Curated annotation (Swiss-Prot):
Its EC number is 2.4.2.17. InterPro entries: ATP_PRibTrfase_cat, ATP_PRibTrfase_CS, ATP_PRibTrfase_HisG, ATP_PRibTrfase_HisG_short. PROSITE patterns: ATP_P_PHORIBOSYLTR (PS01316). One of its GO terms (biological process) is L-histidine biosynthetic process. Lacks the C-terminal regulatory region which is replaced by HisZ. It comes from Burkholderia orbicola (strain MC0-3). The keyword Transmembrane helix does not apply. This is ATP phosphoribosyltransferase. It catalyses: 1-(5-phospho-beta-D-ribosyl)-ATP + diphosphate = 5-phospho-alpha-D-ribose 1-diphosphate + ATP.
Length: 217
């Protein structure tokens, strides 16, 4: 008996916005990860299962073959580096942007012009390092895992690098966006070995995902 294909997803927005793409492939996930304690979820296709992992872990599960394919944000993939992954499709879901933000009273442009060394809090350390290095801005990076908006408010950092959707959370915490680093959307990523060895099983699903993403779900 052939092992089922394994799709790695994270809870929340990416999971919810992937469901219509799965539906386009004729597949439904039969349990809700928000209410189920299970981390391996069956689908209506006996040859496909879904595993629920942290968003930042999706590329690792796919890279090492624990999952055949997955959906991950560009932010996560840039930090990961993309080793061992084939990235055939931008799914155009979970869209947002990665930006630099500061407290409303902080003159970021002036600090940069004067060559000030800035403390920047982020969980996207590699991306932030490359961005500021390319602009010639001197920074000390502080790795945080959440509540990024708090860092400037309590004097931990001069700026943050984080994902922004509507900007409502920034505004609520008296922060302003001063620089966009990149536009973010979620991509389909495929294990390179699986693409060769399981191509017949994978291709119909990948094709359905691509069609659905181009048609807006």
């Amino acid at each position: 008996m052939t092992a089922p294909l394994t799709l790695a997803l994270s809870k929340g927005r990416i999971f919810e916005e992937t469901l219509p793409l799965l539906a386009a492939a004729g597949v439904q996930v039969t349990e809700d990860p928000e209410t189920s304690r299970k981390l391996i979820l069956p689908t209506t296709n006996p040859d496909l299962r879904v595993i629920i992992v942290r968003a930042s872990d999706v590329p690792t599960y796919v890279e090492y073959g624990a999952a055949d394919f997955g959906v991950a944000g560009k932010d996560v993939l840039v930090e990961h580096g993309g080793s061992g992954l084939y990235q055939p499709i931008d799914l155009n879901i979970a869209r947002c942007r990665m930006s630099v933000a500061v407290s409303a009273g902080f003159d970021y442009a002036s600090a940069v012009r004067q060559g000030a060394r800035l403390r920047v809090a982020t969980k996207y350390v590699e991306t932030a390092r490359e961005h500021f290095a390319a602009k010639g801005v001197h920074v000390d990076l502080i790795k945080l895992y959440g509540s990024m908006e708090l860092a400037p408010l309590v004097g931990l950092a001069d700026a943050i690098v984080d994902l922004v959707s509507s900007g409502g959370t920034l505004k609520a915490n008296n922060l302003v966006e001063v620089e966009e680093i990149m536009a973010i959307s979620s991509r389909l990523v495929v294990n390179q070995a699986a693409l060769k060895l399981k191509r017949a099983a994978l291709k119909p699903i990948l094709d359905a995902f691509e069609r659905a993403s181009q048609n807006g779900g």
